[in-house]
Amino acid sequence: MKPSDVRSKAFAMPLTSPAFPMGPYRFVDREFLIITYRTDPDRLREIVPEPLQVTEPLVHYEFIRMADSTGFGDYTESGQVIPVEYNGQPGGYTLAMYLDDHPPIAGGRELWGFPKKLASPTLHVNTDHILGTLDYGKVRVATGTMGYKHKELDIDEQTKRLAGPNFLLKIIPHVDGTARVCELVRYYMQDIKMKGAWTGPASLELAPHALAPVADLPVLEIVEARHLVADLTLGLGEVVYDYLAQ
């Protein structure tokens, strides 16, 4: 294969059979259980990278069911998103996500810089409540529950919240182990069609784990819980800050 052919075909690895396809990446009936809780503000400031700023001591713990997604297939994801500001613009910083499907792990890390790791999350309705779990290996590290569809939420407001900016710290090492890419990336959910939004009483339990340290941000108080169902497109990102250029 000629170098020009390599350049023209290069998108993702392996070259002859990429782990994920080119977008756009559309999700149908994407289901969220988002439990917002209050935590230790000092711990948040220790882990959120500047120039992002922590404005409130809050964490969104998310369980996301994606049964129909372009090129990524059928999978579930779970992790923590921290409300932040960037140059006065409110958004969410994704701290870590755990999922059970290789293509979105590879694509998420290589394209956007999603901090994804392999684990075993679930999200489903259990009789009268929606239940989210996260197992890392044989250890249950997160359990979230919410009463099923106790109260409807405003569709327009929830659509606006979901459409806000999201931030990622993309890190790709050089072949010698030094950082080749270290960037703050911003992306948006696009073409959102909110199909339902509900709230109800909720609980969240986090357990310690050396390699899935969700409990490092302890649950001090449940602030809000939301169950959302939406169709949406995961937009590609833009670099807003290059740490290696500073």
From Swiss-Prot:
Give the matching Pfam families.
Answer: ADC (PF06314)
Supply the name of the protein. Answer: Acetoacetate decarboxylase
* E.C. numbers: 4.1.1.4
SUPFAM superfamilies reported for this sequence: Acetoacetate decarboxylase-like (SSF160104)
Question: InterPro entries this protein is in?
Answer: Acetoacetate_decarboxylase (IPR010451), Acetoacetate_decarboxylase_bac (IPR023653), ADC_dom_sf (IPR023375)
Keyword Protease part of the UniProt annotation: no
Active-site residues per Swiss-Prot or TrEMBL entry: K116 (schiff-base intermediate with acetoacetate)
Q: Which reaction does it catalyse?
A: acetoacetate + H(+) = acetone + CO2
Q: One GO MF term, please?
A: acetoacetate decarboxylase activity
Per its UniProt record, what NCBIfam families does this chain match? PRK02265.1
UniProt keyword terms in alphabetical order? Decarboxylase, Lyase, Schiff base
Family (UniProt): Belongs to the ADC family.
Describe the function of this protein: Catalyzes the conversion of acetoacetate to acetone and carbon dioxide.
Lineage summary: Bacteria, Pseudomonadati, Pseudomonadota, Betaproteobacteria, Burkholderiales
